[in-house]
């Protein structure tokens, strides 16, 4: 009886579910049924490319792009063998051989890796989808590329506009592809061209890409060694005889495609550079290949970060507000700090203001996406730590705020016409005949603002934030332990107090008889660079005006002294039950320096509990001597906040002989550490940074500066009066001698 009614009930439920799904798809037409695209971003094995790859992979995940993604990476055998396993498994990856050195021409050129990567990938694999979107690793994908809207097909690809490729329509094209007839359209360049002026990204059918990939490499090599290319290519880096164009690879692609009858149509708005005004539409792709600024106090250039290592786990040194080598990039301004502006109908001034506001939001979103990508990687590959939790919470907060402001701005910007012929096309019925294109470019004229979805990707960092919350709970029991209260690593009151390492003790430098106001020493912003055309930069990074590195901590006591005693902290738990993970977490909770944390982690991996060294009395007395001498330095702050030392401080700092010292016969030279005067605290420096100069000061008695400092106001006034009177008494004699010299008299 039950079975009789069970079948119809299930069938009815299924029909109801299908009806609901059909209704949902009617409200959001075709989003789930879009054609999949295989996104391939091309890169190499350098550390400089690793952080870009992390950003590219994360941006694909957050863009809502239908399809799949692959990283095609060119590496030498040695590089591939030693490549970081965490980075290798981060995203689907194909490793191709390194091709920077051409076997055919003998030329060395890093961009040969782009065609070689595609050749090797397609020679051994078949893309999962019919259409491939080829990107560089220094791009952030922010909106999906839809085949139905952009219209690529076999024989016709889509690419960004690069009009400085003048060689497609001059003698350069004739020298390399004379058999290709001139074109009589302007879809991707001027009339009479023999190839298309495209670059940046390529939205192309997989069969076309495979067919022309070998010629992509061949023509890149040919243009590179063409002795006339310097005057025909339009490359601003190649203007003298013998110069080899940096954009040879772009010509290789254009000539290779034309040689296989693959042509393009321009897409003028899908890809822009941060800092450029998005006047032709809503960009889908941000290419951060050039220097850009946000407001007046923030700037970013990827070339400043050749040494950024995305694989380094906390602890991170994030003090430098301009340049960092690990962790996250300096945080951009928050969108809430900008003045909101929205366009008004018929008001061009308000539209200009809105474009400026939207431009700033896009730049902020680009940096926020990169930092969110780094946190995504660290959460999956680093042990729990309070710094990781606190830093990444702030990163995700900024990322979500940027997307919220972007979505609000683009809701207004979406209901616009981005082509001057929209009205004309509407009259000819194109709003119905060519609905996808008109929805993309003539939304307002065709009355599509509220009827067609705007394709803003509804992706969030909720899952990552949940992982952070779980990580924070794992750290909570440690923070409640009396030995590790709030993660500060403070010792229990019943035991001897923890000795704070010398390099972590702040030193306040106060001028005599004066309490200085609290001032912040900030690094200046990077120098503004002129923006070259959107072509790859030279291999070596440009100079960066970053602040000098902080000095290392004072040197350890000499070997002839007895080793310092150590104090062992109270065990967190039964030693037999302490796991390796708990030991590693303990390292990040203790109040240790960076080097000590590294030693602690190393000991934890071996299953040992790290012991914090305790300073002996003799060691503390010896370290107090250079500190006392350093406190006598007379520091001044100039108008820009930089600290300088007065001329009197050039006199060597000395210390009276210590007759009680053993083994030095009553004499002992104290090694005085001169610290970077821009650093007003004795903080621990990075081990990779340069050492501070050390001077052995001889024993010569009290310094002139210390003697003058003991005078009161009246004594100082009398001293200066004596100096002035003496100087005035010498003036007539000096004048008399000068008169004798001019009159030819002999002077002794």
From Swiss-Prot:
Weak activity with Fe(2+), Co(2+) and Zn(2+), but no activity with Ca(2+), Mg(2+) or Cu(2+). Residues 1-26 form the signal peptide. InterPro entries: HPAT-like, HPAT/SRGT1-like, ShKT_dom. It is found in: Membrane. Residues 415-449 form the ShKT domain. Keywords: Disulfide bond, Glycoprotein, Glycosyltransferase, Membrane, Signal, Transferase, Transmembrane, Transmembrane helix. GO terms for cellular component: membrane. The chain crosses the membrane at residues 711-731. This is Peptidyl serine alpha-galactosyltransferase. It comes from Chlamydomonas reinhardtii (Chlamydomonas smithii). The gene is SGT1.
């Amino acid at each position: 009886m039950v079975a009789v009614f069970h079948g119809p009930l299930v069938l009815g439920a299924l029909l109801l579910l299908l009806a609901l799904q059909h209704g949902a798809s009617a409200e959001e037409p075709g989003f789930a049924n879009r054609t999949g695209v295989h996104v391939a971003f091309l890169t190499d094995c350098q550390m400089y490319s690793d952080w870009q790859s992390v950003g590219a992979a994360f941006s694909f995940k957050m863009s809502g792009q239908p399809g799949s993604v692959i990283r095609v990476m060119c590496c030498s055998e040695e590089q591939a063998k030693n490549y970081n396993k965490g980075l290798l498994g981060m995203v689907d990856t194909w490793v191709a051989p390194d091709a920077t050195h051409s076997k055919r021409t003998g030329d060395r050129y890093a961009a040969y890796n782009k065609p070689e990567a595609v050749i090797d990938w397609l020679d051994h694999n078949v893309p999962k989808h019919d259409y491939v979107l080829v990107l560089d690793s220094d791009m952030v994908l922010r909106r999906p590329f839809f085949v139905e809207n952009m219209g690529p097909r076999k024989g016709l690809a889509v690419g960004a506009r690069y009009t400085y490729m003048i060689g497609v329509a001059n003698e350069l094209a004739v020298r390399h592809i004379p058999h290709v007839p001139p074109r009589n359209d302007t879809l991707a360049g001027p009339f009479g061209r023999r190839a298309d002026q495209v670059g940046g990204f390529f939205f192309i059918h997989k069969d076309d890409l495979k067919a022309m990939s070998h010629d992509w490499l061949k023509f890149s090599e040919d243009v590179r060694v063409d002795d006339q290319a310097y005057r025909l290519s339009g490359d601003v880096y190649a203007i003298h005889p013998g110069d080899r164009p940096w954009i040879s690879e772009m010509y290789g692609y254009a000539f290779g495609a034309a040689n296989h009858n693959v042509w393009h149509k321009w897409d003028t708005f899908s890809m822009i550079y941060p800092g450029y005004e998005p006047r032709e539409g809503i960009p889908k792709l941000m290419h951060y290949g050039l220097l850009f600024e946000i407001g007046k106090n923030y700037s970013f250039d990827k070339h400043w970060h050749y040494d950024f290592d995305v694989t380094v786990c906390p602890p991170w040194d994030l003090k430098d507000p301009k340049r960092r080598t690990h962790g996250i990039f300096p945080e951009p301004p928050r969108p809430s700090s900008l003045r909101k502006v929205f366009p008004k109908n018929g008001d061009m001034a308000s539209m200009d203001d809105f474009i400026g506001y939207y431009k700033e939001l896009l730049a902020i979103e680009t940096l926020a996406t990169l930092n969110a990508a780094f946190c995504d990687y660290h959460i999956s590959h680093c042990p729990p730590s309070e710094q990781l939790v606190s830093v990444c919470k702030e990163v995700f907060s900024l990322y979500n705020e940027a997307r919220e402001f972007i979505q609000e701005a683009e809701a207004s910007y979406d209901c616009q016409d981005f082509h001057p012929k929209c009205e004309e096309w509407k009259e000819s019925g194109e709003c119905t005949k060519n609905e996808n294109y008109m929805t993309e470019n003539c939304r307002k004229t065709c009355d599509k603002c509220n009827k067609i979805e705007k394709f803003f990707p509804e992706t969030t960092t909720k899952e990552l934030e949940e992982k952070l919350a779980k990580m924070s709970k794992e750290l909570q029991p440690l923070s409640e332990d009396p030995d590790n209260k709030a993660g500060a690593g403070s010792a229990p009151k019943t035991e001897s107090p923890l000795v704070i390492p010398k390099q972590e003790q702040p030193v306040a430098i106060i001028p005599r008889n004066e309490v200085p106001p609290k001032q912040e020493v900030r690094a200046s912003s990077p120098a503004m660079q002129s923006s070259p055309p959107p072509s790859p930069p030279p291999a070596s990074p440009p100079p960066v005006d970053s602040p000098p590195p902080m000095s290392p901590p004072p040197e350890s006591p000499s070997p002839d002294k007895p080793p310092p005693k150590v104090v062992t902290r109270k065990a967190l738990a039964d030693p037999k039950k302490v796991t390796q993970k708990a030991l590693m977490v303990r390292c990040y909770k203790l109040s240790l320096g960076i080097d000590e944390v590294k030693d602690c982690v190393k000991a934890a991996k071996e299953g040992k509990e790290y012991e914090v060294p305790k300073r002996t009395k003799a060691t503390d007395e010896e370290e107090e001597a250079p500190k006392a001498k350093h406190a006598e330095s007379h520091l001044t702050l100039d108008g820009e906040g930089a600290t300088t030392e007065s001329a009197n401080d050039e006199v060597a700092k000395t210390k009276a002989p210590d007759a009680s010292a053993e083994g030095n016969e009553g004499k002992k030279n104290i090694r005085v550490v001169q610290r970077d005067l821009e650093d007003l605290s004795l903080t621990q420096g990075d081990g990779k940074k340069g050492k501070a100069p050390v001077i052995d000061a001889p024993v010569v008695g009290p310094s002139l500066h210390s003697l003058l400092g003991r005078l009161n106001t009246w004594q100082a006034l009398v001293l200066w009066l004596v100096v002035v009177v003496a100087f005035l008494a010498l003036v007539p004699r000096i004048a008399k001698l000068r008169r004798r010299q001019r009159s030819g008299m002999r002077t002794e």
